[in-house]
A protein has these predicted regions:
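Carbohydrate-interacting regions of secretory-pathway proteins
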Residues: 9-138
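Short, exposed "boundary/linker" segments that immediately precede the start
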Residues: 1-7
């Protein structure tokens, strides 16, 4: 099963639906979702269905891993075990083009909210989170 860390718009999230930018967490070798999407954009560390993470990642299958998401204004970075995997800027023409080519194309203003909620989601496998921290950057 897949697991994701989401950021959700305060205005766009419906009570029955949680749609937002996703840091994809899964075992690329074992989960079928890693084989879907375009050019690896549904693999570990990717911005789900939008931006693929590199093929080679510092992923430890037998222990806890450290995932970090840094958001400063519209600039976002995905880190795994101290290695930056991807970075992107929301609210740009490039961002809007990525969204238009994704499964989120029908969600107005997808991913552009300045604030929202955080969601940890799993689709069926056992997954553990520990030491979850949120720090406001200045």
């Amino acid at each position: 099963a897949t697991t994701e860390i989401y950021t959700l718009s305060l205005h766009d999230a419906l009570p029955i639906s949680a749609i937002g930018c996703e840091f994809q967490i899964l075992d690329d070798d074992k989960h079928p979702d890693a084989k879907l999407g375009v050019k690896g954009n549904r693999k570990l560390g990717s911005l789900y269905d939008l931006i693929p993470a590199p093929e080679k990642k510092p992923f430890n299958k037998k222990d806890f891993n450290t995932a970090t998401i840094i958001v400063q204004d519209n600039h976002v970075e995905h880190w795994l075990n101290g290695v930056k995997l991807i970075e992107y800027t929301r609210n740009t023409d490039m961002w809007n083009a990525l969204v238009a080519y994704s499964k989120y194309k029908n969600w107005p203003n997808f991913g552009n909210s300045a604030e929202g909620n955080i969601l940890l989601q799993d689709h069926g496998d056992e997954v553990w989170f520990k030491n979850v921290k949120i720090k406001e950057l200045k």
